[in-house]
Amino acid sequence: MTTTEQTQPDQLGTLRDRVTFVTGGTRGIGAAICRALAGAGAAVAAGYWHQHERAQQFHDEMLAAYPGSEFTVHEGNIGSADDCRRVLSEVIDRHGRLDILVNNAGITIDRTVAKMTDEDWQRVIAVNLSGAFFMAQAALEHMLERGSGRIINVSSVIGETGNIGQVNYAASKSGLFGLTKSLAREALFQLGRAGHPVSDGIGLTVNAVTPGYIATDMLGTIPDKVLDRIRSQIPVGRLGNPGEIARVVCFLAADESAYITGQIWAVNGGLDM
């Protein structure tokens, strides 16, 4: 059955023979990204933490929805540098290579500044920002050896606007902007030093996508009155759906995006205008 989260027919095959790894890939936006990448022909590995039954269920759903596709799930704590390196190595060992990394994993621990503990701050930064760095660091080493690759960081409109009670989350997501731009510059610099021409082929690019308010489980705890107020502030008048984020990620992962790097792609219904 076709859903808004699945890739449209004209996208099929654009990522054939590519291997992708999506952190936080078994639910919400991450699951939609996995579906879109698989629909475009890629072999997909999805990262998760703790939720074994959900991960196995999603694994089975993916194999049923995309017969003949390669799809694996890998458990790891994104907040641990050692786990990041281990999981990425596991993905490469399993699939033989890595072409595309999507840093999607993220958590929230919401508190006002006065009530936020050291652990509240450090945990969110560790998963949302440090984890993205450690994953990208390990992926870049492999991609530079091969001479090509894609890294796509999933940030948030909250990283641009800030939000009461989310200073840790906003800081982590804003940090991804600087991480993206610096990685993009360094990737091309190192690519040239390694003797790979930066002007030919698909290149090695790093970009970010900044979703607005997307209809996922993460919004499930927000009261209806608050959601109505949020909708009223969005120029297009509605929440986004995960598939709309996934389609942008698919484009940035494709060869056709080779001239785009170090950029922040806002997908938020005009919320930041």
Locations of the language-model features?
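Conserved glycine-rich cofactor-binding loop
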Residues: V19, T26-R27
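Short, small/polar-rich loop/turn modules that mediate ligand/substrate recognition or access, typified
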Residues: L188, G192, D200, T205, ...
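Conserved glycine-rich Rossmann-like NAD(P)H-binding loop of the short-chain dehydrogenase/reductase
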Residues: A40-Q57
